[in-house]
UniProtKB/Swiss-Prot annotation:
Family label: Belongs to the universal ribosomal protein uS2 family.
Lineage, uppermost ranks: Bacteria, Bacillati, Actinomycetota, Actinomycetes, Micrococcales
GO molecular function, one term: structural constituent of ribosome
GO biological process: one example: translation
TM stretches of this protein: none
Segment forming the signal sequence: none
Organism, scientific name: Micrococcus luteus (strain ATCC 4698 / DSM 20030 / JCM 1464 / CCM 169 / CCUG 5858 / IAM 1056 / NBRC 3333 / NCIMB 9278 / NCTC 2665 / VKM Ac-2230)
Name the record gives this protein: Small ribosomal subunit protein uS2
Gene this protein is translated from: rpsB
Region (Disordered) location: 231-285
Record has Ribosomal protein as a keyword: yes
Record keywords: Ribonucleoprotein, Ribosomal protein
């Protein structure tokens, strides 16, 4: 079964690039044609690049890696949080703070500060050691930290790879990943630079449906990698207990496997025994 179909790509508008006056000549090889002043992306290439990126993400996660999901533009914020959350991966969907990767130790301290503030009961003024004004200021600090760092609260170290929606907007994230040698997997619209991305997916990085589809595909690859990782652990007596979301993924996978196994058995009796003879008849004419 393919990771994604041509019909899904078309329905989601993955093939629509930018206006012809807004393009990067390095993207020429990914462009199929031009229509009404808009570049049309070659979806046959997109399909093969999706397969390549999917395999990389799956294998990276299967071997214990982490994928950081990054997309701070409005069209990407919801999909990034939802899909990363679905598979228990870290994400940044509000604002990229300089040094999130290259100065990770300092960022980790800010995450720790956020966790400390979360321990405060802001409703209990009398029981706290702070004044009303101090609590108000601390609450504002917490809200800001949660918006910027909430998605990476459980990221203990720099990620193994980064999934990026819109490499031009997220150029800081891409630059930091490149400095550290962290592979970037990203949607490449017709105005992007393919040299910045190790695993490109030529496609529309502006349409919500396109961003949703491709981010879900990457999350599916993560899910498959987690299942493979857990399968490898199952033979170890000292394996760590699964997180709730990991257990849900494994249960979904097992249910799908069971359905697929039942389907052929249910269909088998419906096949007519005379089918080969019926097929042979036209050849005798």
């Amino acid at each position: 079964m393919p990771v994604v179909t041509m019909r899904q790509l078309l329905d989601s508008g993955v093939h629509f690039g930018h206006q012809t006056r807004r393009w990067n000549p390095k993207m020429k090889r990914f462009i199929f044609t031009e229509r009404n002043g808009i570049y049309i992306i070659d979806l046959q290439q997109s399909l093969s690049y999706i397969d390549r990126a999917y395999e990389f993400v799956k294998e990276t996660v299967a071997h214990g890696g982490t994928i950081l999901f990054v997309g701070t533009k409005k069209q990407a914020q919801e999909a990034i949080a939802e899909q990363a959350g679905r598979v228990g991966m870290p994400y940044v969907n509000h604002r990229w703070l300089g040094g999130m990767l290259t100065n990770f130790s300092t960022v980790s301290k800010r995450v720790q500060r956020m966790k400390e503030l979360e321990e405060i009961d802001f409703e209990d003024v009398a029981g706290s050691q702070f004044t009303k004004k101090e609590l108000l200021l601390l609450n504002r600090e917490l809200e800001k930290l949660q918006a910027n760092l909430g998605g990476i609260r459980n990221m203990a170290k720099t990620p193994s790879a980064v999934w990026v929606v819109d490499t031009k907007k997220e150029h800081l994230a891409v630059d930091e990943a490149q400095k550290l040698g962290i592979p970037v997997v990203a949607i490449l619209d017709t105005n992007c630079d393919p040299d910045e991305v190790a695993y490109p997916i030529p496609g529309n990085d502006d349409a919500i449906r396109s961003v949703n589809l491709l981010t879900r595909v990457v999350a599916d690859a993560v899910a498959e990698g987690l299942i493979a990782r857990q399968g490898g652990k199952s033979g170890q007596a000292a394996a760590e207990p699964m997180a709730e979301w990991e257990r849900e993924l494994l249960e979904q996978h097992n249910a799908q496997q069971a359905e697929q196994a039942e389907a052929p058995a249910a269909e088998a009796p419906a096949e007519p025994a005379e089918a080969p003879a019926a097929e042979a008849a036209p050849q005798g004419e």
